[in-house]
Amino acid sequence: AYQTDFQTEGFEKFELVYLGKGTADEYRNVDVKGKLVLVEINQREEWWINYPVYQAHLKGAAALIAVQSRGYAQIDDTALNAQDIAGPPEAPAFSMSRADFLKIQKLMKAKQEGGRTLPEITVEFDAETQVKKDQYTYNIIGKIPGSCSDSMILLSAHYDSYFEGFQDDNAAVAMIIGIARALIRGGYRPYHTIVVCALAAEEWGISDTKYDWSTGAYRQVFEARPDWPGHVIADFNFELPAHAHSTRDAVRCTYEYADFIQKFVDTVLMPEGIYPDGMTTLYPIETWSDDFS
């Protein structure tokens, strides 16, 4: 389930109808009131899940079930996906693996061959998902005092996660703690105070808004520690470090730091066997990680 409200209180029968990508054209002359709507979406190359979810909600559907087509589905057909919903809790949404979708698709085709005009079957659905508002999460910080106490360098990563969260982003939390431990064990005394930040609510933190991610980092800077702006000279934020993703590594930064970072990147000796195309500098920063705050 996504961050939405839906309770069946046990198994409940629904009609499940497949509507392609869930666009307005695919709803034409189709009554989905009280039904489960099954769609295929590609959140990387087309649109986010909130658009087909809200479309289904406005049409009176009981809920929408999303299957990732390409994009986030490329790891494995059995993989489930979950991201932030960027929408209201009363528009329920669920995730289904491609493997399960292909089984259901076969059943729907058999029904169509039997005379049904729409790809539709009857299913039993059991769901319990509830959004509890005004709950607490905690950002965890530690400091290595520098000789200049008025300036800070942040090492940040988020510890909230979907599923096991090893890649996104617990491996990064271990990295920043390991960096801090190495500095302390080595007896290094920094000039700038080093602040290690394990941040909450990066994946999702506010209901019923398009901007529901990176909440923990935003509130750390603008609410919990409003004294930080003007004193942080850099934030080194770490995301998805456990898997290479590509043949080339990259440091993403603001425009102002691009030349400085590139000079550093040019001096890095890449370990043998990883990133055969080396490392580069990308800019500007993206909204999809805590450093944007």
Locate predicted features.
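Metal-dependent peptidase/peptidase-like ectodomains
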Residues: A91-A93, F101-L102, S149-D150, L199-S293
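Alpha-helical metal-binding/catalytic segments enriched in His/Glu/Asp
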Residues: I140, S151-K210
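A non-catalytic alpha/beta surface segment that caps or lines the substrate-entry region
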Residues: A1-E15, G87-G142
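Solvent-exposed loop/turn segments at secondary-structure junctions
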Residues: T23-A24, N42-E46, S69-A73, D100-F101, ...
